[in-house]
Amino acid sequence: MKKEVVVIGGGIVGLSCAYSMHKLGHKVCVIEKNDGANGTSFGNAGLISAFKKAPLSCPGVVLDTLKLMLKNQAPLKFHFGLNLKLYQWILKFVKSANAKSTHRTMALFERYGWLSIDMYHQMLKDGMDFWYKEDGLLMIYTLEESFEKKLKTCDNSGAYKILSAKETKEYMPVVNDNICGSVLLTENAHVDPGEVMHSLQEYLQNVGVEFLYNEEVIDFEFKNNLIEGVITHKEKIQAETIILATGANPTLIKKTKNDFLMMGAKGYSITFKMPEELKPKTSSLFADIFMAMTPRRDTVRITSKLELNTNNALIDKEQIANMKKNLAAFTQPFEMKDAIEWCGFRPLTPNDIPYLGYDKRYKNLIHATGLGWLGITFGPAIGKIIANLSQDGANEKNADIMLFSAFFRD
C-alpha cells in the first residue's frame, strides 16, 4: 500500500500536522495504535499558555522544587533508579534554569503562541466546534515571595492585570483566604482539549484524510537514506513523507537510530462538576504548586503532577489524593461531583523545546515530538511549521525549525 504522507500518531500534534499538510493539498494518512478516543491530548489542561509564562526550567526552580518536595507539593516527582537518561535529563534541566535560556524560551513561546492562536481561529473558521475562550490565564500566588517576584516582571503593556486576594475571588470564587493575590495574563486562552480532538478528527475525516485506528506501527524498512516501508501489525505501507508524532513512546524513535533527551512524564487530571457559583471564570494556575484549574462547558478540570522515570500506566491514588489535598489548602470546601480521574504520559524535554525537523539519516522522515505539557498550546503551530518544512525540503531552509527545534538548541 502506497501513501503520499503518513502521520504516525493521532494526538494533537499528529492531527495538527495532518490538518496543515492537507491544507497544502497532500493526501494524508494518520496511523494511530489506539481508537483515537482517549489519548494523552484528551487529558490536557487545555491551556494555551504561551504568553508571559516561564517554562518549567527557569531561575530558582531547583530550590523551589526541593522546598515543595518537603511539603509533597512539587510539580515534578522523580523515581530515581538505574536510568542514565534520567540523570542526563536532570542535568540539562538544571543547566537550562538560567535567565538567558528562560528569556529566549519565553520569546519563542510568544512567537509560536500567536501562531497557534491563529491556527485555532482557522479551525473555527473551517467549521469546527469546540470550547475556546480568549479570556486570559489567572496566575494565583500562595507565597508572598513568589507573588512579589512576579509583580516585578509586570509592565503597563496590557498583558498583565494585577489583582489583590479579594479581587482574585471575582475570577476564582472558590479560593479561600490563604492566597496572596494573582496576575491575569490577558493574552492567554484555553480550550476543551477533548472537544478540539473530536472536532479535528471529524473535520479531517470529512475532507478525506484517511485514519487507520487500532493499527500499531512496529517497525520500519530502510533502504539507503530512506524509509522504504512503515510496518504495522497488519500491513506494510510505503510513503513519500513520514511524520513521526508518537509523543512519549520512544520505541519508534529508537528504531530510527535516534535517542532523544526526552522523558515520558506521567501527568494527572481530575474532571468533575462543581457548584456553578464557585466555578472559575477563566483558566487558572496555582503557580506555587503548579496546579491548573480550567472551566469547560459543564465541568472543571484540575491537572497537576509530573512523574519522571516510571512506566506504570495505572492511576496512582496517592497522587490523586495529594492533588486534592494541595487544592483544598487554598479553596473553600466543595464536592467534586462525577469525578473522572485520568493519567497519561507526555513527551517532556528538559528545556520545553521540542524535537522538530527532518531526520539526520532518513530523508523522508520528519520528527514532531517533545511538547510535554504544552501539546495543546503549541500543537497547531507545530503542524503548520512541519507542513512548511515539507515544502522547504531541509531543516536549514526553515527559520522556525532553526529557532524552535531541540536539534539546533544547546
Curated annotation (Swiss-Prot):
GO terms for cellular component: cytoplasm; plasma membrane. Keywords: Cell inner membrane, Cell membrane, Electron transport, FAD, Flavoprotein, Membrane, Oxidoreductase, Transport. It is a peripheral membrane protein. It is found in: Cell inner membrane. The keyword Acyltransferase does not apply. Its EC number is 1.4.5.1. GO terms for molecular function: D-amino-acid dehydrogenase activity. FAD binds at G9, G10, G11, I12, V13, G14. InterPro entries: FAD-dep_OxRdtase, FAD/NAD-bd_sf. It catalyses: a D-alpha-amino acid + a quinone + H2O = a 2-oxocarboxylate + a quinol + NH4(+). It holds the Pfam family DAO. Gene3D superfamilies: D-Amino Acid Oxidase, subunit A, domain 2, FAD/NAD(P)-binding domain. Its cofactor is FAD. Belongs to the DadA oxidoreductase family. Catalyzes the oxidative deamination of D-amino acids. Has broad substrate specificity; is mostly active on D-proline, and to a lesser extent, on several other D-amino acids such as D-alanine, D-phenylalanine and D-serine. Mediates electron transport from D-proline to coenzyme Q1 in vitro, and is involved in the electron transport chain from D-proline to the c-type cytochrome in vivo. This is D-amino acid dehydrogenase. It comes from Helicobacter pylori (strain ATCC 700392 / 26695). The lineage of its organism: Bacteria, Pseudomonadati, Campylobacterota, Epsilonproteobacteria, Campylobacterales. The gene is dadA.
